[in-house]
Amino acid sequence: MKWKKILYITSFFVVLSCKKSDNQSIKSWEVISENVQYSEQNDKFLLKSRKFEYSFEKKELPFSKVVLLNNSLLGYFLELGQEEKIVGISGVQYVYSNEIQQLIEKNKIQNVGSDQKYDIEKILELKPDVIFTNYIETFENTYKILQDNGIKIIFLDEYLEETPLDKAAYLKLFGKLLGEEKQAEEIYTKIKNDYENIKQKAQKSPNKPKVLANEMYGNHWYIAGGKTFSANYLKDAGADYIFKENQDKKSVPISFEEVFVKSKNAEFWVNAGNYRTKKELLAMNAIYEKLDVYQKGKIFGMNKRRRGMANDIFESGAVRADLVLRDYVKIFHPEILPKDTLVYMQELK
């Protein structure tokens, strides 16, 4: 009986020791945002991005040859100084960065098509370590062809995050995947601290101006859902978004008549496209002239850093939440940031 007791005790401590060893090699999940998190488990790197889950060998990191099928992800690479790891990109006409355009001209970055049709043959020739893209259901067949040919695709839908800082936090994920973890953490911390500081100042203002946002496409006005990062920018900037009670996490199409009624007391109209003048705005849709805010308020477009079809607010602005918030606060509460000038936005005259 005594030897059985000794064997039991010995076995218990062996199992306990093994469990402790296993736990030491398994890290808890690192939460990047509401939709993205990753974990390192033994020799595996695990990633969750909304409904998608990935597992690959840690020795595959850092990635050194990347294809981007969405320009909105470009800003993260630029912020980390990792643009030379990009070997292919789609929609080159929408690229704002001079650095990227120069790399395209030198053929160091290849044009791999557009959001209408990707150049599968070109992508396969490039043999990238990974493709980063937003998930678009209509391209499911294209994704399958690439995956069947051994190409790794990671779907990242940063535009579906609810808060600007969650969207900016993808910088930390790219830092991990590109071997720039420390730099990414430092940059993100600075962005977050600056954002929170500006937000705190704006929240203290007793004045909360009513604000209309976005514009019409076809016969509908696509408002920012009340739970989108766009709506949260306005809230954090100390504004009263007229559709704040909406509970959607994406853009919502509504009629012009609904906007007309709801925007009666709006003092500002922001995110009014890429137009530079009110005349350009009316040329797109003359019905805007009926809005009170068009006649009496101030209108701001996301047009200050625009070149051709490219706009930097969708590039660097995807990461620099602090600069975007500064623009909104400068518009709604100029007294808070008297020395600042607008970075991405500009008033339509």
Regions found by a protein language model. Give the residues of each.
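Bacterial Sec-dependent N-terminal signal peptides
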Residues: M1-Q24, Y328
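Bacterial Sec-exported substrate-binding components of ABC uptake systems
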Residues: C18-L74, K182-L212, K278-K279, Q295, ...
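A short, structured surface patch at a secondary-structure boundary
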Residues: F45, S49, K59, S64-L124, ...
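Second-shell loop/turn segments in exported
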Residues: P62-S64, Y76, I109-S114, V130-T133, ...
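Structured C-terminal subdomain patch of bacterial secreted/periplasmic proteins
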Residues: K65, L165-G179, Q183-E186, N271-K349
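Soluble non-cytosolic domains of exported or imported proteins
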Residues: V67, G113-Y118, I136-E140, E161-A168, ...
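Extracytoplasmic ligand-binding site segments that recognize negatively charged/polar headgroups
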Residues: G91-N98, T138-N141, D157-K172, N207-N232
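Flexible, glycine-rich surface segments
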Residues: K201-N285
